[in-house]
Amino acid sequence: MSRLSAAVVAIDGPAGTGKSSVSRRLARELGARFLDTGAMYRIVTLAVLRAGADPSDIAAVETIASTVQMSLGYDPDGDSCYLAGEDVSVEIRGDAVTRAVSAVSSVPAVRTRLVELQRTMAEGPGSIVVEGRDIGTVVFPDAPVKIFLTASAETRARRRNAQNVAAGLADDYDGVLADVRRRDHLDSTRAVSPLQAAGDAVIVDTSDMTEAEVVAHLLELVTRRSEAVR
């Protein structure tokens, strides 16, 4: 049974803040559903790459995005992402998609379609934790609970590099740091839905916090806010 009365918990922030893992754990603690909107942009990006299109070709990206068929699970303990019925949960996390997703997600038509889909997917019984980059500012600007996670670029690069090494990839902190800074620039300067905290969001710097500490802090924030809106 859900411990949350507020319908939507919006969690935004750049990559490497622990956003995805924290959001999943928070949803589990709250007994809420979970929606990873970043995975949706990755699915569209994978569709673009599979079609052999250039991610910077706006017309081609728009055409592909308008017809792409996707579905995602709501279980915070799972990672079910499907493209045209095929499980692509692992493939969308690959380097090729990671390098191209910023270009694809900056296309206005892509964001328009996915925002509509995100709002539809969030409907249903119970509460939902939605994580992304424009949830509190664009997708659910009226969400009763808005949280923006942040951390220094260096901290986020260390975390991402450690994940790569643990997964058997090369130890390349400098390369990861450069990619983090590049992604930050692209996300914060794009014309449509730039990455920024909502004016009424609670900003949490996770640089010196463990994942468990962040989850405990957010659980307290969400519970307190939920009680306030009852």
Swiss-Prot record:
Keyword Cytoplasm: yes
Quaternary organization: Monomer.
Class of enzymatic activity (EC top level): transferase
Sorted UniProt keywords: ATP-binding, Cytoplasm, Kinase, Nucleotide-binding, Transferase
Catalysed reactions listed for this entry: CMP + ATP = CDP + ADP; dCMP + ATP = dCDP + ADP
This protein's GO CC annotations: cytosol
Pfam families reported for this sequence: Cytidylate_kin
Protein name: Cytidylate kinase
Transmembrane segments: none
Cytoplasm is among the record's keywords: yes
Gene: cmk
InterPro entries attached to this UniProt entry: Cytidylate_kin, Cytidylate_kinase_dom, P-loop_NTPase
Coiled-coil regions, chain positions: none
Source species of the chain: Mycobacterium tuberculosis (strain ATCC 25618 / H37Rv)
